[in-house]
Regions:
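Active/binding-pocket-proximal capping segment
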Residues: 89-91, 100, 104, 125
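Residue-level detector of Asp-centered blade-edge/turn motifs that repeat once per structural unit
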Residues: 35-36, 99-100, 147-148
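CBM-like carbohydrate-recognition segments
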Residues: 144-145, 152-155
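Short loop/turn segments that connect beta-strands within beta-propeller blades
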Residues: 12-16, 76-80, 124-128, 173-175
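A flexible loop/linker signature enriched in serine peptidases of the S9 family
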Residues: 1-7, 22-27, 43-71, 84-92, ...
């Protein structure tokens, strides 16, 4: 928390040339670079009302965050061109670029009436073309691709015998 808030930074592997990329009040995290290294996708909760700001700062003072409402953002790797990708409400998180760098896959509970049902979705880099990928009644999240783009891995609470255990699933990816 160099700036007093949870921001995104880049730096060289030796710790030199630290650059702050984000500066708006709120929790910025879960960042991943695009395959070509030119863009970064991340999740963020951005408090706007006085009550939200007070709650955020109170939690932050205790080293905590309560990011129940998170949206996805994309920014150029040099810190320019910040754009909000999703406007879905609830929790949109665990973003990851598809291997071709043209879409983002992420987890969201925006369609869940009670909030605990998370599924995977894809979206274009301009925020259009939202498409649901998984249709589970529990929790699917943390999607990532194999280096060749032929497999997707993700965590899920499906097929766990009614426990809260989360397991890793690997599936063929068909675009």
């Amino acid at each position: 928390m160099r700036s007093g808030d949870l921001e995104l930074y880049t730096m060289n592997i030796d710790g030199s040339d630290v650059k702050q990329l984000t500066s708006q009040l709120g929790y910025d995290g879960g960042a991943f670079f695009s395959p070509d290294g030119s863009k970064i996708v991340f999740r963020s909760s951005r408090p706007t009302t006085e009550a939200e700001i007070a709650e955020y700062k109170s939690f932050l003072a205790e080293g905590l965050v309560a990011p129940t409402n998170m949206e996805l953002y994309i920014i150029n790797a040099d810190g320019t061109g910040l754009r909000q990708l999703t406007h879905l409400g609830k929790a949109n998180w665990a973003p990851f670029f598809l291997p071709d760098g043209k879409k983002i896959i992420f987890s969201s509970n925006h369609a869940a009436p009670r909030g605990y049902q998370f599924n995977l979705y894809t979206i274009n880099l301009d925020g259009t073309g939202l498409e649901q990928v998984t249709f589970d009644k529990t929790f699917d999240s943390f999607p990532m691709f194999s280096p060749d783009g032929k497999k997707i891995s993700f965590s899920s609470n499906r097929n766990n015998g009614g426990t809260r255990s989360t397991n890793l699933f690997v599936a063929d990816w068909v675009d």
